[in-house]
Swiss-Prot record:
Gene3D superfamilies cross-referenced by the UniProt entry: 1.10.238.260, 3.30.160.270, Aldolase class I
NCBIfam families for the chain: leuA_bact, PRK00915.1-3, PRK00915.1-4
Compartments it resides in: Cytoplasm
Classification via PANTHER family: 2-ISOPROPYLMALATE SYNTHASE 1, CHLOROPLASTIC-RELATED, HOMOCITRATE SYNTHASE-RELATED
Gene this chain is encoded by: leuA
Domain of life of the organism encoding this protein: Bacteria
GO CC term, one of those recorded: cytosol
Assembly information from the UniProt record: Homodimer.
Cited function: Catalyzes the condensation of the acetyl group of acetyl-CoA with 3-methyl-2-oxobutanoate (2-ketoisovalerate) to form 3-carboxy-3-hydroxy-4-methylpentanoate (2-isopropylmalate).
EC number in record: 2.3.3.13
Pfam families attached to this UniProt entry: HCS_D2, HMGL-like, LeuA_dimer
Name listed for the protein in its UniProt record: 2-isopropylmalate synthase
Length: 513
């Protein structure tokens, strides 16, 4: 009999913890829809008790997504658990994921609790959560570095209280595959009631082994749930990569012999959406979703590919959503063709007004660029002004700049602040510097730019440039993304996008009080 492997995606929760990767409610909802198309089993939508913004995002996703289980993280206390349950009320299938640290280091230095106090807190929190929802996951934070005897006692107690999934995290990415696999196996063998719960793995990539450790937890340890993120997004070195786990299990079914619900045809679209939403560019040689993942430059390899694809390809690019023959749109393309392409790409805009706004932007772009590729469309709809233009504090209107060799560039930027048009102008070390300084003449954000990067969306000189700007202010870090055939305009859009996110974060912090 073939076992099922549950795919638990935490892009919207653990992935978002990567500095600068914070997402708006609308962005999270758009990604959640794509995860549902991908047929992810469980979507961890956020940490409902952490902020009003996170609560609203979890609530919106729970009210919208019908096929996937929707999960909220919570600490092991009644307030967090109650908040999670409230946010999940509209879900078809709801899960509360509660956690508390169990390693000696964390208990002593962070929690300042005794092992017995932690055990009791874990037990009571799972009992409380089970009174609110039928599906409860428990995680012993820093589980891999916990004492095995003590950890077995904790896990036995929470299963007795009704935990349906036991997730054992390698919180700091310290594990190596064989040892981690046997660690999971030992726990399952020594916890008397282990058969009453599904066992899960959650691995971080600090030593580059998150995927290998997760697969070892499955094959050696007997885990049947893997927690992962699109593109391996996550704090520090990231998390276990969903696309790599899925395609490893599918490609080597002869070895793993596991079934999954996942539809891999939507993997590339999910990867692009997360990358363009967060501004975290996928490296070209990234397995499965990198631009070079299916490219062959060696003459010997190319010759073999022409004779028989299987000589150098172990999986087909089109099986994960790479399109062999792309439909290219242009200025003569109509609204229906545009709407169909959005659907094919897994983009679901909430209203006809949003579609109309997106189509108007598409036509503007088509007047400047003869061919519109999928990447252009995804960049266009990832602009938050499409879906919540009424909520923007700052909006781009126009830009003019003058620069000559040997002269200091000058820029004039017209933008809106709370709906009112403002004209800023400034000199700078270059056209981009002048444009951003022109914005700051009125905004005076006090933010520090910690990252500025430019990426060509497609391969030609006619390509749009996609600019990512990362700003830091008072401990808050945000990414803004802007796209335009003019790199200077794209930079101004990205800067205003980042300022909007800084403002949104400040509002959420103020609301929390």
């Amino acid at each position: 009999m073939t076992d099922k492997l549950i795919i638990f995606d935490t892009t919207l929760r653990d992935g978002e913890q990567s500095p600068g990767a914070s997402m708006t409610k609308d962005e999270k909802l758009r990604i959640a829809r794509q995860l549902e198309r991908l047929k992810v089993d469980v979507i961890e939508a956020g940490f409902a008790a952490s902020s009003n913004g996170d609560f609203e995002a979890v609530q919106a996703i729970a009210n919208t997504i019908r096929d996937s289980t929707i999960c909220s993280l919570s600490r092991a206390n009644d307030r967090d658990i109650s908040r999670a349950a409230e946010a999940l009320k509209g879900a078809n299938n709801a899960r509360i994921h509660t956690f508390i640290a169990t390693s000696a280091l964390h208990m002593e230095k962070k929690l300042r609790m005794t092992p017995e106090q932690v055990l009791e807190q874990a037990r009571l929190s799972v009992r409380f959560a089970r009174n609110l929802v039928a599906d409860v996951e428990f995680s012993p934070e820093d589980g891999y570095r916990s004492d095995v005897d003590y950890l077995c006692r904790v896990l036995e107690a929470v299963i007795d209280e009704g935990a349906t999934t036991i997730n054992v995290p390698d919180t700091v990415g310290y594990a190596v595959p064989e040892l981690y696999g046997h660690f999971i196996k030992t726990l399952r063998e020594r916890v008397p009631n282990s058969d009453k719960a599904i066992w899960s793995v959650h691995c971080h990539n600090d030593l580059g082994m998150a995927v290998a450790n997760s697969l070892a937890g499955v094959m050696i340890g007997g885990a049947r749930q893997v927690e992962c993120t699109i593109n391996g997004l996550g704090e520090r070195a990231g998390n276990c990569s969903l696309e790599e786990i899925v395609m490893a299990v599918k490609t080597r079914k002869d070895y793993f012999n596991l079934e999954m619900n996942i539809d891999p045809l939507h993997i590339v679209a999910a990867s692009r959406m997360v990358s363009q939403t967060t501004g975290f560019v996928v490296q070209p040689n990234k397995a499965v979703v990198g631009a070079n993942a299916f490219a062959h430059a060696s003459g010997i390899h190319q010759d073999g590919m022409l004779k028989a694809r299987e000589t150098y390809e172990i999986m087909r690019a089109e099986d994960v959503g790479w399109s062999a023959s792309k439909m290219v749109l242009g200025k003569l393309s109509g609204r229906n063709a545009f709407k169909q392409r959005l659907q094919d790409l897994g983009v679901a805009l909430e209203s006809e007004a949003d579609i109309n706004t997106a189509f108007a932007r598409f036509k503007e772009l088509a007047d400047r660029k003869s061919e519109i590729f999928d990447e252009d469309i995804l960049a266009l709809v990832s602009d938050e002004s499409i879906t919540h233009h009424d909520q923007e504090q700052y909006g781009f209107v126009s830009l003019a700049q003058h620069s000559e060799t040997g002269e200091r560039p000058h820029a004039v930027v017209v933008f809106t602040v709370a709906g009112k048009e403002i004209r800023g102008e400034s000199d700078g070390n270059g056209p981009v510097d002048a444009s951003l300084k022109a914005i700051e003449t009125h905004v005076k954000s006090g933010a520090e730019m910690v990252l500025y990067s430019v990426n060509a969306i497609s391969g030609s000189t006619e390509s749009q440039g996609e600019v990512t700007v990362r700003l830091q202010n008072n401990g808050r870090v945000v990414n803004g993304v802007g796209a335009d055939p003019d790199i200077v305009v794209a930079s101004a859009k990205a800067y205003l996008s980042a300022l909007n996110k800084l403002q949104s974060k400040a509002d959420r912090v103020a609301a929390q009080g």
